[in-house]
């Protein structure tokens, strides 16, 4: 009887440990998502501050990003 109880307790501990490990692995990725969301919002605020003569630089930067995304990786 003791062996059955010990086996059940061991399995419960293993399941709880696995779930805790998954949760603690999820927390850093959630923090990264929050940081990128705030950076994106800050980027939009900075773009609103650009003067019209400087907006052309941002367009060129986007064109280069578009060009690089379509280039094959060597």
Curated annotation (Swiss-Prot):
It is found in: Secreted; Target cell membrane. Expressed by the venom gland. The keyword Secreted applies. It comes from the Eukaryota. Keywords: Amidation, Antibiotic, Antimicrobial, Cleavage on pair of basic residues, Membrane, Secreted, Signal, Target cell membrane, Target membrane, Transmembrane. One of its GO terms (biological process) is defense response to bacterium. GO terms for cellular component: extracellular region; membrane; other organism cell membrane. The modification Lysine amide is found at residue 39. Its main location: secreted. Residues 1-22 form the signal peptide. Belongs to the non-disulfide-bridged peptide (NDBP) superfamily. Short antimicrobial peptide (group 4) family. Cationic host defense peptide that have antibacterial activity by breaking membranes. Is more effective on Gram-positive than on Gram-negative bacteria. This is Antimicrobial peptide 36.4. It comes from Lychas mucronatus.
């Amino acid at each position: 009887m003791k062996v059955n109880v010990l086996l059940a307790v061991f399995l419960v501990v293993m399941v709880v440990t696995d779930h805790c490990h998954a949760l603690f692995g999820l927390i850093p990725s959630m923090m990264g998502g929050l940081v990128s969301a705030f950076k994106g919002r800050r980027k939009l605020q900075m773009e609103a501050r650009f003067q019209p003569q400087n907006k052309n630089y941002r367009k060129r930067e986007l064109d280069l990003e578009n060009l690089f995304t379509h280039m094959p990786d060597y």
